[in-house]
Design a protein with these regions (language model features):
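Long, low-complexity, intrinsically disordered segments
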Residues: 258-268
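Alpha-helix boundary/capping detector
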Residues: 83, 101, 211, 235, ...
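Short, intrinsically disordered/low-complexity patches at protein termini
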Residues: 43-45, 109, 230-231, 240-242, ...
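Short linear motifs centered on Gly/Pro in flexible linkers and helix caps
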Residues: 53, 230-231, 260
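Conserved SAM/SAH-binding loop
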Residues: 12-17, 246-254
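Short, conserved SAM-binding/catalytic segment
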Residues: 1-5, 230-246
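Short, basic, helix/turn surface patches
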Residues: 135-143, 243-252
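Core catalytic lobe of class I
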Residues: 1-227, 265
Length: 268
């Protein structure tokens, strides 16, 4: 490996501009949380005692139409034959992911993340929003780390991301707990594998990957979120290496250079 900073390739850019530089069959595990587009399905504010009203308008970026078909070809191209693809999604996007990916993998399935502390339904007028879906795909030779049938349920349970883990500055509306990301990484990859998250947010997938001895490539278009991700990932590096490695903030001004410097990660 040429560059000792291979572990923390964190880029502030549009993922569509980055993914084209990634070589074919080079990623072991794509674990990502793209927009759900729930903002378009908002039914208005739900008043909650002692806190801001809740609605589906999580952020302006969630209102921009997200088309899974625009990502399917590149995901398939960069994923190794032994790789896995896990995508957090919602009821309104699950079918779209299925339609563009199911026929291109040997197996597609889904996991359920059961949130043990969802927002309450004050007026008891419907189900609690206590579950999120993860669409999963793989081929026959994929990495799969289970030691018993009991572990193989497609169901994972944890609270939503809370303080002190949840960031307040910046506050990301859909920050995922590192604990569930680590569980997925343990299942679907091996130490030293390359994990790719093209919708990195504040870097939780990167934190989980590095804590488990994996390599990580993360891309985030929002500068504030990306800065937070870099800070969190640098903290992990410093904690795990007594001498510490200087955190190389990438020069995001020249996209054409990404293929030259950052992709040293793929060279043994």
């Amino acid at each position: 490996m040429k560059d000792p900073n291979w572990q923390k390739c964190v880029l502030c850019a549009d993922s569509k501009d980055i993914i084209r530089h990634i070589p074919d069959n080079s990623i072991d595990f794509i674990l990502t949380d793209p927009p759900y587009n729930l903002g378009k399905h908002s039914t208005g504010n739900i008043p909650l005692p002692g806190r801001s009203a809740m609605n589906n308008d999580v952020a302006e970026w969630d209102k921009v139409d997200f088309n899974p078909e625009e990502w399917a070809d590149e995901f398939i191209r960069i994923l190794k034959p032994t790789g896995n693809l896990f995508i957090f999604t919602s009821y309104n996007q699950l079918g779209r992911w299925y339609e563009c990916l199911d026929h291109r993998f040997d197996t597609s399935n889904f996991m359920i993340w059961h949130k043990t502390n969802p927002a309450p339904k004050i007026f008891k007028a419907g189900f609690l929003n206590s579950c999120e879906m993860i669409f999963t795909c793989w081929n026959k030779r994929h990495t799969w780390n289970f030691s018993s049938q009991k572990e193989m349920h497609n169901f994972i349970e944890s609270p939503i991301c809370m303080r002190p883990e949840r960031l307040s500055a910046p506050k990301h509306p859909t920050q995922k707990p590192v604990s569930i990301l680590k569980k997925m990484i343990e299942i679907a990859s091996n130490p030293n594998d390359i994990i790719f998250d093209p919708f990195m947010g504040v870097g939780s997938t990167g934190v989980a990957a590095l804590e488990l001895g994996r390599k990580f490539i993360g891309v985030e278009i929002n500068e504030e979120y990306c800065t937070a991700a870099r800070r969190r990932i640098n903290d992990i590096i410093c904690q795990h290496q007594e001498a510490g490695l200087a955190f190389a903030m990438e020069d995001d001004s020249d996209l054409d250079n990404y293929g030259n410097f950052n992709l040293d990660i793929f060279e043994d």
